[in-house]
Structure formats: structure tokens, C-alpha cells
């Protein structure tokens, strides 16, 4: 029996964990490690940002859903990989051993690379995460109270910003 750790509980990690369970059956331990207990369906973030969806319509509780498929979940995130001992160490200090490690962490947002960007203190909005999209909706509502010019675009180095233009 193999111990498989899937690092990242976003679109890639959730899909990978479910696919592994389906292909490998119940004979192997699969542990999904993500930061926080909520999964947000990223492709729906633009709809959240314009008010076509509510946050609860595009999020779900990870532990409850993966648990039904015999997949363990840890919501503390991975603090570090201990490759010498074949284990990940979570943000809560738990050491989770693995025989196989699948890294599905997704992008690391780097708004600090371009001054003035980012939803936290910048002059821009984002739909990269569900909380960002919810904040963008709130900012849009405030904008409607005092309208002005709008610029839509992406900064150099941005990847996969197509969904924002939907």
C-alpha cells in the first residue's frame, strides 16, 4: 500500500486526488494538503466579481467532500517538504510521510512585483482567488457610487488572465 500526498487543494490538487482514488482504488492512502478548508471554483470567480454568483455558490467544504471518497484532508497547508525523510511538514507542525508526492500548488501571486497592483492596498482588483473576486464585487459596488474611468488589462508577466475578460 502506497502513501500518496497531494500538495495543494485547488483545482489541480482536488482533481488529481479524485483521479488517483478512481484509478488506484481504495488500496492506497491519499492525503490532500491545502491551506484552509474551503475550495473555490476558480473559473466562476469572474461571475462572483460581477455579481452573477454568490460566494457560497462557488465554494465547498473540502474535508467533507474528499472524505466521502476515502481521501484524508489537512487544511494547514505545507510549510516545507522534507525530501530526505519523504514527508511534508504542515503549517500546524504535523509531519505527513509519503511514498509519492504530487505538487499541485498553483501559482504564487506576486502583486508586490508591480507597485500599485493587487487587491490589498493597490489600485487594482483581481479575480485570481475567490476572496479576491468577492472583494472586487464590493469595490465595484463602491465604484458605482462615484463612477470614473476604468482600465481593464493585465500587467506584464501575468499568466492565464483570459478568464477575467469573460
Task: List each model region and its residues.
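Beta1-alpha1 glycine-rich phosphate/pyrophosphate-binding loop at the start
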Residues: 2-72, 156-166
Amino acid at each position: 500500500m502506497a502513501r500518496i500526498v497531494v500538495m495543494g487543494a485547488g483545482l489541480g490538487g482536488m482533481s488529481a486526488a479524485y483521479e488517483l482514488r478512481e484509478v488506484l482504488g481504495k488500496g492506497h492512502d491519499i492525503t490532500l494538503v491545502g491551506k484552509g478548508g474551503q475550495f473555490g471554483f476558480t473559473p466562476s470567480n469572474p461571475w462572483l466579481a460581477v455579481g452573477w454568483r454568490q460566494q457560497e455558490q462557488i465554494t465547498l467544504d473540502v474535508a467533507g467532500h474528499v472524505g466521502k471518497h476515502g481521501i484524508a484532508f489537512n487544511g494547514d497547508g505545507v510549510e516545507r517538504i522534507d525530501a530526505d525523510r519523504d514527508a511534508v511538514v504542515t503549517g500546524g507542525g504535523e509531519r505527513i510521510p509519503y511514498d509519492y508526492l504530487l505538487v499541485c500548488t498553483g501559482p504564487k501571486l506576486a502583486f508586490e512585483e508591480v507597485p500599485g497592483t493587487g487587491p490589498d492596498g493597490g489600485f487594482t482588483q483581481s479575480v485570481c482567488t475567490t476572496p479576491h473576486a468577492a472583494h472586487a464585487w464590493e469595490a465595484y459596488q463602491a465604484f458605482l457610487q462615484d463612477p470614473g474611468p476604468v482600465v481593464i488589462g493585465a500587467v506584464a508577466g501575468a499568466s492565464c488572465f483570459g478568464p477575467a475578460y469573460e
